Amino acid sequence: MNENTTPLHPAFLTRMKEMLGNEYPSFLSSFSAPRTYGLRINTSKITCEDFENLSPFPTRQIPWIKNGYFYDEDIRPSRCPYYQAGLYYLQEPSAMTPASRIPIEPGDRVLDLCAAPGGKATAAGAALQGQGLLVANDISTSRARALLRNLELFGIPNVFVANETPAKLTKAFPEFFDKIILDAPCSGEGMFRKEEALAKDWTPEKSLELSEIQKELILQAADMLRPGGLMLYSTCTFAPAEDEQTVSHLLENRPDMELAEMEDYEGFSHGVPEWGNGNPELTKCIRIFPHKMNGEGHFLALFRKKGQAIKESSRPHTKPDKNAFPLIEEFLNEIGLKTLCGQPFDWERVEIRGDKAYYLPPVAHNFRGITFLRNGLYLGDLKKNRFEPSQPLALAIRKDEAEAVISLSASDERITRYLKGETLNIEPEEAAHKKGWHLLCADGYPIGFGKLVNQILKNKYPAGWRV
């Protein structure tokens, strides 16, 4: 996009000139520069070193994101089998920054309050390594469905995908979470170069309207944070009303919240106290400008809730219905699966709802009354005298966890045919067993299930996932 094809609103330009001073010409020139493209490695499935050795297309490390890489505009990483295996997430480089600046650890209870389409939620889920709990919420049902798909693709088993209002979540989770991500709905000024429609629709009033929503959201989020916990607030806008002023609003209304330092980078700019309420602590906020970084515009602030965390013991799961367990156990034995996401398979976490089996997150909680799309990992369906595994289960299995595998090169045309829903011819030496359920892998990384009969792999890749 450039200034001539999509004129920027005069009020926006006037404000940016006042904000940036002598940097304004460089900022304006950035709108004529090509945008950058990035992908983030799913470190719960593959190391960055292994990805670099495997990648069939050239990449360059994003210097401020440990597991982030630039790729060229003419490359289509979503067409690569590694994408279907959930090894990476396509994300604008600056948008990777917020999740990289909140230190999520395995076992944490994490909330992503406005999570769709899943860029930050998948990053948080990967950091949890299958331990703890991730509550990923979006108020829009259609967006929550897209969020669920991305979490399934990433193989995140310990997630509760909610489709609820923040006000209702606040009542359900008072001071419950160790870490919270609030990527607030905003005017999107930082994305004008990437999405021209945002620039066309911008008005001076929109930013003020959204700032009122953000002020409400940030207070609600703070109420769900445990003492000693961390909360990351981010926007993709330059507007002080949505950035420093929203941060100031929280600090003024919640004296138990304070700003925390984040890992810095030479290209980052920082919050400006005068753009908020004058609090010098606002310099701890980070601003990303497109004329100073290889990325779009972003703002982020990290908060800590004062006080000491009191670790509560997790409540036990409800007593599982074990009538269906033999069918599931028979399948797990057939494919030789004893661990899931590096953790021993825990039968206490298996829940049967109707004819479907789920693997609940290790942190049990009473979610009654909350509208949700998924609680845990969808294992599969119970059909008469057999168990049919799900696609999310296939993607939650890590490399080398299952024994009954058929591992082909990602460049093997049979992988492409499998992803289209076709049956495959398999040589005897390529399969672990002569018949039965197998996990098809691309260079060892699971893509989906198939059933082997007479050297023919019957395709079990769901129609809704096919490419």
Name each model-derived stretch.
Residues 177, 230-233, 238-358:
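Class I S-adenosyl-L-methionine
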Residues 142, 179-219, 236-243, 269, ...:
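Mobile active-site "lid"/loop adjacent to the S-adenosyl-L-methionine
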Residues 137-175:
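S-adenosyl-L-methionine
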Residues 128-129, 225-227:
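Helix-to-beta-strand junctions that scaffold the AdoMet/dcAdoMet cofactor pocket
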Residues 37-96:
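Conserved AdoMet
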Residues 107-116:
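Conserved class I S-adenosyl-L-methionine
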Residues 1-54, 296, 306-467:
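Polybasic, low-complexity RNA-engagement segments
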Residues 117-130:
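Conserved SAM-binding loop of SAM-dependent methyltransferases across substrates and taxa
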